[in-house]
C-alpha cells in the first residue's frame, strides 16, 4: 500500500469537501421586482432589470456575500409568488402597510415617499372639486386605495395593471389626472418625451409612506440579514451614492 498516495488522495478529498462547504455557505437569495416602475425598477434595452431597487438589492447582496438573482414579476403576483416560494424577497418599492403586514414581513424602510396628483400643464386643480374628472392610478397601490376611499361615486376612477399604462392614457387624453407616488412621477416628468406637457397638482401627502423589502411571514433570519446589510450601506455611504444616481435629493 502506497502511503503517499493515501495521504495525497485524502488531501484532495478534504480540499474538495472544504470547497463544497465554501460554495454552499453563500446564501442563495432570489429577489423579485416589478420592472415597470422607473426609476426604481425597469427593464433595460438588454432585457435586464435595473433601477434604484435593483442597485440596492445588489449592494445588500454584496454586504451579505450572498449569491443573488433578481427576477421580474407582475405587481399583482408579487406577494402570491413570495408566499409560494417562487422567490425569497420582494424589492419593488412596496409600501409597508397594515394589510400587507398580515401576510408578509418587512425589513426596515429603505426609502420613504408620498402621493401626489399630476395633470396637464395649466389645467385647474381643486382637490375638493373633482366631480366628473377621470382619475387614474395603478391597481393595488396606496394611490388606488386613496382614490377608492375618497372619490368613489364622486369621480370616474380607472385602475391599471402597471404605471406605464397610466401614463399612456394620461398622454392620450383618456385621463384628466393621475395619482401616484411622487418620486417615480418626478422621474417621468423629467425624463419622458411627454413630461414637459404635465405638472404636479397640489402638494405631496401621505409622506410617511415607508418602503421596505418584503419577506415571507416568519422568515426572521433573512429579515435580520437584510436589515444588517441595509444599516451597513447607510453607514458607509454606498446607499447615498445609489440615491444620488437617481435623485438630486435624499429619499431616505
Model-derived segments and spans:
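A ligand-binding cleft/hinge motif common to bilobed small-molecule-binding domains
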Residues: 77-80, 92-102, 148-149, 176-207
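Ligand-binding clefts/hinges and TM-proximal coupling segments of bilobed small-molecule sensing domains
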Residues: 142-160, 196-201, 230-252
Amino acid at each position: 500500500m502506497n502511503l503517499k498516495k493515501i495521504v495525497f488522495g485524502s488531501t484532495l478529498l478534504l480540499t474538495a469537501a472544504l470547497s463544497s462547504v465554501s460554495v454552499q455557505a453563500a446564501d442563495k437569495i432570489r429577489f423579485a421586482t416589478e420592472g415597470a416602475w422607473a426609476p426604481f425598477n425597469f427593464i433595460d434595452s438588454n432585457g435586464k432589470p435595473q433601477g434604484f431597487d435593483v442597485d440596492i438589492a445588489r449592494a445588500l447582496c454584496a454586504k451579505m456575500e450572498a449569491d443573488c438573482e433578481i427576477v421580474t414579476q407582475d405587481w399583482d403576483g408579487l406577494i402570491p409568488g413570495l408566499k409560494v416560494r417562487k422567490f425569497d424577497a420582494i424589492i419593488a418599492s412596496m409600501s409597508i402597510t397594515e394589510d400587507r403586514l398580515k401576510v408578509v414581513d418587512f425589513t426596515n424602510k429603505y426609502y420613504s415617499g408620498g402621493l401626489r396628483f399630476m395633470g396637464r400643464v395649466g389645467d385647474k386643480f381643486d382637490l375638493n372639486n373633482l366631480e366628473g374628472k377621470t382619475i387614474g392610478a395603478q391597481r393595488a397601490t396606496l394611490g388606488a386605495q386613496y382614490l377608492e376611499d375618497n372619490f368613489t361615486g364622486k369621480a370616474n376612477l380607472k385602475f391599471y395593471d402597471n404605471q406605464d399604462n397610466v401614463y399612456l392614457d394620461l398622454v392620450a387624453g383618456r385621463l384628466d389626472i393621475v395619482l401616484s407616488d411622487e418620486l417615480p412621477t418626478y422621474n417621468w416628468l423629467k425624463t419622458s418625451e411627454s413630461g414637459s406637457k404635465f405638472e404636479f397638482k397640489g402638494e405631496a401627502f401621505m409622506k410617511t409612506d415607508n418602503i421596505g423589502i418584503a419577506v415571507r411571514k416568519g422568515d426572521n433570519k433573512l429579515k435580520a440579514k437584510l436589515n444588517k446589510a441595509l444599516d451597513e450601506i447607510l453607514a458607509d455611504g454606498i446607499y447615498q451614492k445609489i440615491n444620488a444616481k437617481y435623485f438630486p435629493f435624499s429619499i431616505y
